[in-house]
Amino acid sequence: MKTTFLDFEQPIAELEAKIEELRFVQDDSAVDISEEIERLSKKSQQLTKDLYTNLTPWQVSQIARHPQRPYTQDYINELFTDFHELHGDRSFADDLSIVGGLARFNGQPCMVIGHQKGRDTKERALRNFGMPRPEGYRKAERLMRLAEKFGLPLFTFIDTPGAYPGIGAEERGQSEAIGRNLYVMAELKTPIISTVIGEGGSGGALAVAVADSVLMLQFSTYSVISPEGCASILWKSAAKAPEAAEALGLTAHRLKALGLIDKIVSEPLGGAHRDPKGMAAMLRRALADSLRQFHGMSTNDLRQRRFDRLMAYGKFKETTPGA
């Protein structure tokens, strides 16, 4: 698949186009231009490295939304075996913006839940652009309780712009469904490991992210509102999104510094979409390390640790100037 380049990546796109053109010419030419191709390839790699070393929060937001970025289903296919998808909330419908089911991780039975976006117009509509309705969160709750019943570790993957704000969703209890999931996850008697793989949008993300260990991919985001939404409220213009992204502190490094996440999983040069299999391999190691730390921990200790973790959020100390 041809790589889609973002606006700020245009210098890289131009170099890659030149490299592709030379490769095409080389196939029909007696002149050896392999050295020139190699030189431009190294230049492209260095340019990508320089660019990705100095990303702004707004640029990170764009990468987190990249249309070719791996989604939950992609990670399920790469990281888990014997996946058996479970459908429906047993109350209203089956929301396809949430996928989940039984699987094995490194041979160990587990439960997997995550947001799922679409690749083309038809699938995006089918998946509601990764924005769950109440029935999606209630399906997730059902699978969480199944994981608890059978003593299975729970892996969740977060990638949503937010919960669906439609009238029907509100009528069916969107806020109640999200709140219920927060309550259930806080008390679940099994290890929970959550990973933000793309967008972590507000309560729609948090509803499957109350965990014993929270990971974030290097170029993912996690915030209470989108930069555009924040800009529209504070500055009455979505054009101020770059400033809003900076103020929101939505990047993995910022959230790690605040103690809101536990680990940052490095991405391949240019982002996860440049090397999905390489990204999956790095994430596998991170998930295995996170799961290992809860091995042998009693249910009471696990829940107490989770409770202490949640209660520590937002704590601060007041100091007297000059003290």
Swiss-Prot record:
Molecular function per GO: acetyl-CoA carboxylase activity; ATP binding; carboxyl- or carbamoyltransferase activity
Keywords associated with the record: ATP-binding, Cytoplasm, Fatty acid biosynthesis, Fatty acid metabolism, Lipid biosynthesis, Lipid metabolism, Nucleotide-binding, Transferase
Entry's Gene Ontology BP terms: fatty acid biosynthetic process; malonyl-CoA biosynthetic process
Annotated pathway: Lipid metabolism; malonyl-CoA biosynthesis; malonyl-CoA from acetyl-CoA: step 1/1
Any one annotated GO CC term: acetyl-CoA carboxylase complex
Class of enzymatic activity (EC top level): transferase
Family recorded in the similarity comment: Belongs to the AccA family.
UniProt-recorded name of the protein: Acetyl-coenzyme A carboxylase carboxyl transferase subunit alpha
Species per Swiss-Prot/TrEMBL record: Paraburkholderia phymatum (strain DSM 17167 / CIP 108236 / LMG 21445 / STM815)
Gene assigned in the entry: accA
